[in-house]
């Protein structure tokens, strides 16, 4: 078996392990804001960690654009890792886990992006009509 063959399960395991660490760093679970970056962000509340998600998303965009001008691909990977990490903090705060995101991606598998977007628009219209 090659590394490519085992990449997905290892990635999911790594995400699950990281999610466990983040969960353990929640102040409610004994995470100390003076000793843990995750605990500090969670202690400060959603504004703090959501600001970081926004900053990291912007850095992903900038790193991707830099690739068009010869930048190293590793920079994009680094920034996406930061975005995923901070997004996982947000997920944990709201009682969610990477498995929830993976389940949603699996749900979308085989559905074209155009079709999926049309289904969301139809559902939104239906909700608006039912609520009016």
Curated annotation (Swiss-Prot):
Swiss-Prot/TrEMBL GO biological process terms: L-histidine biosynthetic process
Subcellular location: Cytoplasm
Pathway given in the UniProt record: Amino-acid biosynthesis; L-histidine biosynthesis; L-histidine from 5-phospho-alpha-D-ribose 1-diphosphate: step 2/9
Catalyzed reactions per annotation: 1-(5-phospho-beta-D-ribosyl)-ATP + H2O = 1-(5-phospho-beta-D-ribosyl)-5'-AMP + diphosphate + H(+)
Molecular function GO terms recorded: ATP binding; phosphoribosyl-ATP diphosphatase activity
Top enzyme class: hydrolase
SUPFAM superfamilies (UniProt xref): all-alpha NTP pyrophosphatases
EC number(s) from the headed UniProt entry: 3.6.1.31
GO cellular component terms, A-Z: cytoplasm
Top-level taxon of origin: Bacteria
Main localization, broad class: cytoplasm
Similarity-based family: Belongs to the PRA-PH family.
HAMAP family, alphabetized: HisE
Name of the protein in its database record: Phosphoribosyl-ATP pyrophosphatase
Organism: Acidovorax sp. (strain JS42)
């Amino acid at each position: 078996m090659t590394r490519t063959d085992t990449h997905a399960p290892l990635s999911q395991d790594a995400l699950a392990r990281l999610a466990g660490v983040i969960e353990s760093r929640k102040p409610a679970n004994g995470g100390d804001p003076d000793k843990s970056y995750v605990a500090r962000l969670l202690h400060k509340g959603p504004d703090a960690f959501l600001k970081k998600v926004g900053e990291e998303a912007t850095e992903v965009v900038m790193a991707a654009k830099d690739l068009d001008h010869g930048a190293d691909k590793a920079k994009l990977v680094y920034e996406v890792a930061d975005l995923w990490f901070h997004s996982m903090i947000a997920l944990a705060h709201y009682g969610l886990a990477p498995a929830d995101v993976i389940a949603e991606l699996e749900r979308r598998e085989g559905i074209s992006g155009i079709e999926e977007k049309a289904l969301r628009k139809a559902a939104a219209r239906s909700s608006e009509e039912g609520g009016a």
